[in-house]
């Protein structure tokens, strides 16, 4: 085991004994198999360790200088040889025990990735069908949280009706529609890189400590000439912000995206007709004020 300053036992406010002086984190990666069925990457702990033989996401103690994202990705690489650059993080689940916290970092991959045991702490690694997870002997902490975690395995996509959002701010946008759209995208690039801590109540998902959704901004008309967003200096932003320049009706493009994008979808618009079209696809809809308050 590599020596880290987080290694060691501690007790939480409930009196339970936990590994990780500064808390701990694990990585729960989901990916579709060749038939499109979801699977998650789990490791079986070595028999000699705590909860030996139990299954759960790869994870371990957080070092004092690390974020939970760094810890989870590092542990998955150290224990399962998982390439951290091959997954996309979309959220963080927090399990607070009072003075000690375990965070599950949620991520996705386009397909099951190569993974195998590379540490003495790991007995076996497998991409397990989601429907089969509960039949395994699970780590008690993971077993307690699994039913909720299963509801947030898929990423969240926020589809932004740029014309509607820009038009809700009386800042002279009508004088330069492309410039106004560009300013909105710059703000969204910063927001996308840092994530968001809450969602509207209309979105039917369990509460996460932080979401890292993909933002899809739909531009139309003169605004479609807007420049690409400025780099906010944070690596995750480019992959979390997608620009769609509609060649026809922006509303039609938004409705199409709401119908075909996998996972949870949240459409930002105040247009009543568009709202109704998106809701028929199963997407949630919220007005521009929610998004503007985050910028």
Give residue spans per PLM region.
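Short, hydrophobic/glycine-enriched beta-strand segments
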Residues: 24-29, 156-162
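A conserved beta-turn-beta hairpin within the catalytic core of GNAT-like acetyltransferases
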Residues: 49-53
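Nuclease catalytic cores that cleave nucleic-acid phosphodiester bonds
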Residues: 155-160, 167-295
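Acidic, metal-coordinating catalytic segment for phosphate/diphosphate chemistry
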Residues: 1-28, 32-34
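Anionic group-transfer/hydrolysis microenvironments
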Residues: 28, 46, 131, 163, ...
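Entry beta-strands of beta-propeller and related beta-repeat scaffolds
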Residues: 38-40
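Short histidine-centered catalytic/ligand-binding loop motif
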Residues: 55-66, 173
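Unchanged
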Residues: 61-154
């Amino acid at each position: 085991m590599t020596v880290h300053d987080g290694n060691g036992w501690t007790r939480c406010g409930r009196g339970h004994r936990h590994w990780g002086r500064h808390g701990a984190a694990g990585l729960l990666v989901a990916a579709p198999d060749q038939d499109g069925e979801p699977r998650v990457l789990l490791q079986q702990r070595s028999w000699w360790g705590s909860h030996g033989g139990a299954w759960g996401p790869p994870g371990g103690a957080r070092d004092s200088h690390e974020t939970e994202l760094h810890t989870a990705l590092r542990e998955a690489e150290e224990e399962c040889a998982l390439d951290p650059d091959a997954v996309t993080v979309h959220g963080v689940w927090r399990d607070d025990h009072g003075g000690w916290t375990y965070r599950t970092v949620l991520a996705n991959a386009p397909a099951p990735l190569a993974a195998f045991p590379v540490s003495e702490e790991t007995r076996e690694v497998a991409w397990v069908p989601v429907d089969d997870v509960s039949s395994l002997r699970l780590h008690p902490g993971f077993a307690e949280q699994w039913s909720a975690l299963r509801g947030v395995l898929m990423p969240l996509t926020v589809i932004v009706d740029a014309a509607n959002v820009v038009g809700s701010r009386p800042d002279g946008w009508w004088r330069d529609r492309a410039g106004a759209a560009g300013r909105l995208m710059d703000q969204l690039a910063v927001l996308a890189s840092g994530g968001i801590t809450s969602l509207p109540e209309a979105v039917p998902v369990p509460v996460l400590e932080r979401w890292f959704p993909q933002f899809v901004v739909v531009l139309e008309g003169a605004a479609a000439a807007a420049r690409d967003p400025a780099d906010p200096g944070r690596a995750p932003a480019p992959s979390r912000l997608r620009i769609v320049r509609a060649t026809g009706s922006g509303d039609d493009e938004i409705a199409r995206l709401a119908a075909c994008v996998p996972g949870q979808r949240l459409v930002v618009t105040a247009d009543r007709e568009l709202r109704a079209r998106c809701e028929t696809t199963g997407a949630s809809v919220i007005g521009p004020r929610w998004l503007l308050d985050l910028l």
